[in-house]
Amino acid sequence: MLRAQAEIKFTLLNQNYEGGKHFRPVFRFADGMLFSGTVISDHTEYLYNHLYTVDIEFFTVEDEAYAAIQPVMSLGMGLTIQAGSRIIGIATLLDYSYVGQKAAC
């Protein structure tokens, strides 16, 4: 699983988003590299055009996916935040770590 800390900002005019454990937008790392991530923070709502520092857990990023995106990842890189194919915001990657899958016995 990939864990990240990022600054996020939602850019759709006058559109706010509800926070909570079920908030899982899609983050675009590069062309064709889209992963949903659970945004973890104490905020119950994300307001239009405000900057928030949050943690994000990408449960669907496992060994093979991480091997594909790791070469393009760098601190300070920009990501787009999407709902389906619609871009709803931007993010800046502040920190990240990866915990790989353990081999089955």
Language-model segments: which ranges?
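C-terminal effector/interaction modules appended to NTPase cores
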Residues: 1-105
